[in-house]
Swiss-Prot record:
Entry's disease: Deafness, autosomal recessive, 123: A form of non-syndromic deafness characterized by bilateral, severe to profound sensorineural hearing loss with onset in the first decade of life. Sensorineural hearing loss results from damage to the neural receptors of the inner ear, the nerve pathways to the brain, or the area of the brain that receives sound information.
Protein's membrane topology: Single-pass type IV membrane protein
Topological domain spans for side Extracellular: 297
Biased composition (Basic and acidic residues): 1-12
Main localization of the protein described in the UniProt heading: membrane
Sorted UniProt keywords: Cell membrane, Cell projection, Coiled coil, Deafness, Hearing, Membrane, Neurotransmitter transport, Non-syndromic deafness, Phosphoprotein, Transmembrane, Transmembrane helix, Transport
Database matches in InterPro entries: SNARE, Syntaxin, Syntaxin/epimorphin_CS, Syntaxin_N, T_SNARE_dom
Entry protein name: Syntaxin-4
Feature type site, description Required for neurite tip localization: 290
GO biological process, one term: organelle fusion
Family: Belongs to the syntaxin family.
Pfam families cross-referenced by the UniProt entry: SNARE, Syntaxin
Source species taxonomy: Eukaryota, Metazoa, Chordata, Craniata, Vertebrata
Native species: Homo sapiens
Subunit structure: Component of the SNARE complex composed of STX4, SNAP23 and VAMP7 that interacts with SYT7 during lysosomal exocytosis. Found in a complex with VAMP8 and SNAP23. Detected in a complex with SNAP23 and STXBP4. Interacts with VAMP2. Interacts with SNAP23 and SNAPIN. Interacts with LLGL1. Interacts (via C-terminus) with CENPF. Interacts with DOC2B. Interacts with STXBP6. Interacts with STXBP3; excludes interaction with DOC2B and SNAP25. Interacts with STXBP4; excludes interaction with VAMP2. Interacts with STXBP5L.
């Protein structure tokens, strides 16, 4: 009969390696040795996560402020300044996250050399998932600002109709919006129309807001285009990563349940042993008593 012990051992080694890979995908920050490269890596990951959460909060604040300004015919300068400050903070946080992601990105040479390393794949996983979260948040911010721009344009269009300036077509309106200066935009409106001072002020304010908004959108686009492209190329890989993380988390959870069950079974086995020992002791005592009584009798 052929000795297959070596093959079985190889199978066990392969299974152990798969288990290690699964666990590596869901390694929790703080489990690495203090001062080790992994601990430093996870410290950076925690920092990025915290910054992404902070960015998300700022995006929510921006959305609320935009809704408030849209509901105000003539928003105060302080409101517009607060909105611009939020945009600046979002851009600054975006730059910070981009640099932080760059710092944990596995170098190509290192990744190629250690492609099958569990540690390398874990780092690529963390970088990929964080990058995707970042890009999704920025896409949400850009979409939100684009929608805000359209609502401002609609407010201008509505004001023009109210003031009998309805002859301005959508194309002409876009051309005037692209003029780059509020004064030029307003003078173009005044050429052939009679506009009230209040309506004129609102139109001018909306136009200035649109200009600032467009600059913000362009700057965000310039900052994050390369990262969005990279994440799009890695989209399938990131989806696999998320699937692996979920399955790995289930795997670890099942493992914890198995350990818990094993401990409970172990406790039950110990209790059974104690009960058996007690029963045996009682039986021995009874036999001794019976034998003693018989001998005396």
């Amino acid at each position: 009969m052929r000795d297959r012990t070596h093959e079985l051992r190889q199978g066990d080694d392969s299974s152990d390696e798969e288990d290690k890979e699964r666990v590596a995908l869901v390694v929790h920050p703080g489990t690495a040795r203090l001062g080790s490269p992994d601990e430093e890596f996870f410290h950076k990951v925690r920092t990025i996560r915290q910054t992404i959460v902070k960015l998300g909060n700022k995006v929510q604040e921006l959305e609320k402020q935009q809704v408030t300004i849209l509901a105000t015919p003539l928003p105060e300068e302080s409101m517009k300044q607060e909105l611009q400050n939020l945009r600046d903070e979002i851009k600054q946080l975006g730059r910070e996250i981009r640099l932080q992601l760059k710092a944990i990105e596995p170098q190509k040479e290192e990744a190629d050399e250690n492609y099958n390393s569990v540690n390398t794949r874990m780092r690529k996983t963390q970088h990929g998932v964080l990058s995707q979260q970042f890009v999704e948040l920025i896409n949400k911010c850009n979409s939100m600002q684009s929608e805000y721009r359209e609502k401002n344009v609609e407010r201008i269009r509505r004001q023009l109709k109210i003031t009998n300036a309805g002859m301005v077509s959508d194309e002409e309106l876009e051309q005037m919006l692209d003029s780059g200066q509020s004064e030029v935009f307003v003078s173009n409106i005044l050429k052939d129309t009679q506009v009230t001072r209040q309506a004129l002020n609102e139109i001018s304010a909306r136009h200035s807001e649109i200009q600032q908004l467009e600059r913000s959108i362009r700057e965000l686009h310039d900052i994050f285009t390369f990262l969005a492209t990279e994440v799009e190329m890695q989209g399938e890989m990131i989806n696999r990563i998320e699937k692996n993380i979920l399955s790995s988390a289930d795997y670890v959870e099942r493992g914890q349940e198995h350990v818990k069950t094993a401990l409970e079974n172990q406790k039950k086995a110990r209790k059974k042993k104690v009960l058996i020992a007690i029963c045996v002791s009682i039986t021995v005592v009874l036999l001794a008593v019976i034998i003693g009584v018989t001998v005396v009798g």
